[in-house]
């Protein structure tokens, strides 16, 4: 049972949400009085409460979603709040649906989407993973952060061939290494206000680090927003090459580190927007003609379930007409389908740009 002080804070937070008439978050939409009353006293076996779930969305009323899972059990215990939010965000993933088993499919179906190199600047495919037996950021102790980092770095040090590389802990990182990683756009910063408010940045930078291979086409973030972010990327539009590299890396890491998986929700992550396949396949792409008509761009993107963001990701502008375009759907379809959807959409956008 959650203690009185927590419940009092929850009551205050609920009042604040109710009063915020211009708040458009999914948290506000689905945290009804009856759901709130049903959940406010509950506590996971690791001690997480509804407060851990909603505090970021209460503090940041401009959140799009507004909830995070403090541990794996939270998705089950606080399901009356998470399930409708998941259904709303992952359009059509109903509360009775079950995410399919992992399936990377025929990796040779992926191609270079821009062989002439006129439109696509770079291509990236990433996935998130949580290590079994550990809670998510807000509930991790300093000792757990250190333990996880040592498991991850020793696992990665066994990678061979194209994936072979170096692990750089954030703790005690020299200014030179730091600058080098910033120049390569590899270094992640301490979380933004949304993550800060979710208590995702405790004991920073303990247990956080970055691994990359020698060609800088394969990257792993340790204990950023998720326990692991596994990233494959390169300049140009060869999605096939990028995808194949990611798949081989995930399979290698999984042999040594068991991942948190949920029967219904797929692979578990800190933020419910990343559940399921956890896969985000994206390109940085120049579409000057389509970009002049943002509505048209959004319309085609919507048809292929693509998400259009600014150049530097979420909450940013398109610099020099360069957009970050990715698959929006991560749940209720396989890894193969998620990336295929993105490939089909990008090919269509390029075709339209050429015809304009």
From Swiss-Prot:
Gene3D superfamilies attached to this UniProt entry: ATP:guanido phosphotransferase, N-terminal domain, Glutamine synthetase/guanido kinase, catalytic domain
GO CC terms: extracellular space
Record's signal peptide: none
Pfam family, one: ATP-gua_PtransN
Domain annotation Phosphagen kinase N-terminal: ranges: 9-91
Tissue specificity statement from the Swiss-Prot or TrEMBL entry: Muscle (at protein level).
Catalytic activity entry: L-arginine + ATP = N(omega)-phospho-L-arginine + ADP + H(+)
Source superkingdom: Eukaryota
Gene Ontology biological-process entries: phosphocreatine biosynthetic process
GO molecular function list: arginine kinase activity; ATP binding; creatine kinase activity
Keyword terms, alphabetized: Allergen, ATP-binding, Kinase, Nucleotide-binding, Transferase
Role summary: Catalyzes the reversible transfer of high energy ATP gamma-phosphate group to L-arginine.
Entry similarity comment: Belongs to the ATP:guanido phosphotransferase family.
Protein name, per record: Arginine kinase Scy s 2
Species of the source: Scylla serrata (Mud crab)
């Amino acid at each position: 049972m959650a203690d009185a002080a927590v419940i009092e804070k929850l009551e205050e937070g609920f009042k604040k949400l109710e009063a915020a008439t211009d708040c458009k978050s999914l948290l506000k939409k689905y945290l009804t009085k009856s759901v709130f009353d049903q959940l406010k006293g509950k506590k996971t076996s690791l001690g997480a409460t509804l407060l851990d779930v909603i505090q970021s969305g209460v503090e940041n009323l401009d959140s799009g979603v507004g909830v995070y899972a403090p541990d794996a059990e939270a998705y089950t215990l606080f399901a009356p709040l998470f399930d409708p939010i998941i259904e709303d965000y992952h359009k059509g993933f109903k509360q009775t649906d079950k995410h399919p088993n992992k399936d990377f499919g025929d990796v040779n179906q992926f191609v270079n989407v821009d062989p002439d190199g006129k439109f696509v600047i770079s291509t990236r495919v990433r996935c998130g993973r949580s290590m079994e037996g550990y809670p998510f950021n807000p509930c991790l102790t300093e000792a757990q952060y250190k333990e996880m980092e040592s498991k991850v770095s020793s696992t990665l040090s066994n990678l061979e061939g194209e994936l072979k590389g170096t692990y750089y802990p954030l703790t005690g990182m020299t200014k030179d290494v730091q600058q080098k990683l910033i120049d390569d756009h590899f270094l992640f910063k301490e979380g933004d206000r949304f993550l800060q408010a979710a208590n995702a940045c405790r004991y920073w930078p303990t247990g956080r680090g970055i691994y990359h291979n020698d060609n800088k086409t394969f990257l792993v973030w340790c204990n950023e927003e998720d326990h692991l972010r596994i990233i494959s990327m390169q300049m140009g539009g060869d999605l096939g090459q990028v995808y194949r590299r990611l798949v081989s890396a995930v399979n290698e890491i999984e042999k040594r580190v068991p991942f948190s998986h949920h029967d219904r929700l797929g692979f578990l992550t800190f933020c419910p927007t990343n559940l399921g396949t956890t896969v985000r396949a994206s390109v940085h792409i120049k579409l000057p003609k389509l970009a002049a008509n943002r509505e048209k761009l959004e319309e085609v993107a919507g048809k292929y379930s693509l998400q259009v963001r600014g150049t530097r990701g979420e909450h940013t502008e398109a610099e020099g007409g360069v957009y970050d375009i990715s698959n929006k759907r991560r749940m209720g379809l396989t890894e193969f389908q998620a990336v295929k959807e993105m490939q089909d959409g990008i090919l269509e956008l390029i075709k339209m740009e050429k015809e304009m």
